[in-house]
Regions:
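Terminal and domain-boundary regions
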Residues: 1-93
Length: 93
């Protein structure tokens, strides 16, 4: 079981720290309290790295700092999600 899946089973509030993805209705800093809604699960199916930027609420500050620091794993994942969402958007046009 992945770390994020375990958090959801425990119903711990989690927050999405990745970029806005309008096509999926997923917005930065959305909080989920009782598992992930179906639209988020669909987004993760298309862009699996989204799951890596869904963290416990109490890790928000630390995760944001890592995203803002160039070269960190979190910053690279953030950028990759942006790129993949743009590719999906371009395919629909």
């Amino acid at each position: 079981m992945e770390e994020n899946e375990e958090m959801i089973v425990n119903n711990e509030p989690v927050i999405y720290t990745g970029p806005n993805i309008f096509d999926f209705g997923l917005f930065q800093f959305q909080v989920f309290q009782e598992g992930l809604p179906p639209y988020v699960k669909r987004a993760i199916e298309k862009i699996p790295d989204i799951n890596r930027l869904i963290v416990p609420v109490d890790e928000l500050e630390n995760t944001r700092a890592k995203i803002e620091k160039s070269g960190t794993l979190e910053a690279r994942i953030f950028y990759k999600i942006q790129q993949e969402s743009e590719k999906l958007k371009a395919k629909r046009k």
